[in-house]
Structure formats: structure tokens, C-alpha cells
Amino acid sequence: MEMTSTQRLILANQYKLMGLLDSQNAQKYQRLEAIVKGGFALELKELDKEFSDVSEQECQTVLDTLEMYNALQTSYNNLSDKSALTPHRLQFAGYCAVREKKYLNYLRFITGVEGKYQEFMRCEHGCDSQVPMWDKYMRMLDVWHACPHGYHLSMTEIQNILNA
């Protein structure tokens, strides 16, 4: 992370203030203040880890995935015979907190800050799937988009989407 001296001074002061305001995390903020003041390039990279770039396309894909799960659950609830599939199978897994952190952060923003798709935050482990899910969701979206009635899916269509 490259910063001017002025930016470093401002950030160091912010960390100093945060340490005074948040005594439980004071040691963490003192460390970060020392890193910024010292201009330690290796440790400054830590500051970048909190920032991610999620493109408009990626944001839309996350939203499309949530819509797809909404359609899956709505369609399932409207079926008269649900015996071929358990409701647990329709549960949204989320994204991997290690490998897909930026998608998980966007999901948490959409559900927590924006208040949308609240029903999906009932997923296990805070929606940390603990395995990468992006590619799986992309395959599922392809199958879902090929269905003629996106919100009136048959049991076979639901199973095809889940098995993609």
C-alpha cells in the first residue's frame, strides 16, 4: 500500500484514536499505528487485506444467486409432492470465507446492511460454506436461466439446478 506522508500521519492518528476509544482492541491499534508510522512495507500489506474489489458483474452474480435460491425455495414450497427432496438440500451454503471472502463480504452487506434476503442468513457458519462455491453457483445459474419459468420450477428442474 503506497501512501504519502500526510496520509500516513492521518491514518496513524486514526489508529491512535481508535486505540483510545476501543480499549479491548487497543493493542491491535497500537501495532497498526506503529506499522503506519514506520512505513513497514511488508506489514502495510496487512492493511490491504481488509479491502476488496468486487466488480459490478460479481455483485450481480451474487444477487442472481440469491434470487435463484429464492426461486428454488418458492417453487419447492408450491409443489404438492415434496418427497423427492429435503428442505435442507435447498439451504443456501454461502461462500468460502478463505477463498471467496469478497463474495461473502458482499453477501453480508446485502443481508446485514441493506436488509435484503434475510432468510439466507440462516445458513450455517455465518454463511461460510468452508469450501469454494462460486463455480458451483455459476453452473446452477446456467441451468436456472435455461428454465422457461424461473419461479415455477418442477421438482425435476429444481433437482437439475441443485445437481449442476
Swiss-Prot record:
Identify the domain of life. Answer: Bacteria
Pfam families given in the database record: YfbU (PF03887)
Name the family the entry cites.
Belongs to the UPF0304 family.
Protein name (database record) = UPF0304 protein PM1500
The protein's organism comes out as: Pasteurella multocida (strain Pm70)
